[in-house]
Amino acid sequence: MGPHTQLLILLLLSWLGPLQGQQHHLVEYMERRLAALEERLAQCQDQSSRHAAELRDFKNKMLPLLEVAEKEREALRTEADTISGRVDRLEREVDYLETQNPALPCVEVDEKVTGGPGTKGKGRRNEKYDMITDCGYTISQVRSMKILKRFGGPAGLWTKDPLGPAEKIYVLDGTQNDTAFVFPRLRDFTLAMAARKASRVRVPFPWVGTGQLVYGGFLYYARRPPGGPGGGGELQNTLQLIKFHLANRTVVDSSVFPAEGLIPPYGLTADTYIDLAADEEGLWAVYATREDDRHLCLAKLDPQTLDTEQQWDTPCPRENAEAAFVICGTLYVVYNTRPASRARIQCSFDASGTLTPERAALPYFPRRYGAHASLRYNPRERQLYAWDDGYQIVYKLEMRKKEEEV
């Protein structure tokens, strides 16, 4: 071994001494850190075990309480359903008792035409009607037609309130239903998903036919009382008029219509027994009875009390009639055929006697689908709102003075 090699070995040995000392200190440091981590991990495990035990204890305490709360909730729900059923039953019983024993009306009524049990006064019959407004117009022609859309079934009603907001639309689908659709404006009704824009108003008793009317914030409609048409009993072939407050959603008045032996007034619309109408003069009812099963009858109603003020036997036949409406105290009856063809006003009756049959126009309706299930006149717009085999249609009317010649 040469002197250079010995020198190199001595240098390497001098370097290895400090490196071994540093490695020893590093190992001791790592061992201390690992011991600290193990201690903290043990503490975390102890805390987790303690928290898990506390959660189990809390769960064991809460489960019985939740079971008790669920049982109490079910008991309250059952009790609420029972109370609701009792309230509904009481309301029906009170409503029936009111129709059977109404308060005496504060009007003078001819004893010969006094209503029977549950009815209000029948009023004067076949006397000339005294107009309360200066309305003196009659139809000259049905000028135009606009089909809005198709909504609902073949029979129904859509209308506006002639005394309410000018834009609001009311839709009553079907002949035996209890839910009306209310649209804020006509544009909402014409949308593809119109039902989503509508609010729903549910009435306490289903209506009969398509003779409903919205007037002055109220929904007027006919319902079958116990023993009404098709139900047997002493009220066979009678109907009850309901006055329903649309905002409060309550029945504010009701009365059995003072006519016995009611039959459908329109030969082509068998589901409607009383067809309510509104014009410049107020509230009217079109109906028919077995006493004269060939012609229509007209009644003037008090919208506040549902009293029948006057009644008339009209010369308008029931056969092939499909709908009717009133303008300025004059009844206009629309006739058609089966299968449906082009409808036409073929009979009119002026309760005031101003418009004679010779001066009355008998216009045709524009060509359209199916047959009219309902027609509603809006005196503010001078338009007809028609339900035609599921289509909602607006007819614009051209007017003239009653005294003018055709």
UniProtKB/Swiss-Prot annotation:
Residues 1-21 form the signal peptide. SMART domains: OLF (SM00284). Glycans are attached at residue 248. The keyword Glycoprotein applies. Residues 134-401 form the Olfactomedin-like domain. Residues 22-101 form a coiled coil. One of its GO terms (cellular component) is extracellular space. It is found in: Secreted. It comes from the Eukaryota. GO terms for biological process: signal transduction. Keywords: Coiled coil, Developmental protein, Disulfide bond, Glycoprotein, Secreted, Signal. Disulfide bonds join 135-328. Belongs to the OLFML3 family. Secreted scaffold protein that plays an essential role in dorsoventral patterning during early development. Stabilizes axial formation by restricting chordin (CHRD) activity on the dorsal side. Acts by facilitating the association between the tolloid proteases and their substrate chordin (CHRD), leading to enhance chordin (CHRD) degradation. May have matrix-related function involved in placental and embryonic development, or play a similar role in other physiological processes. This is Olfactomedin-like protein 3.
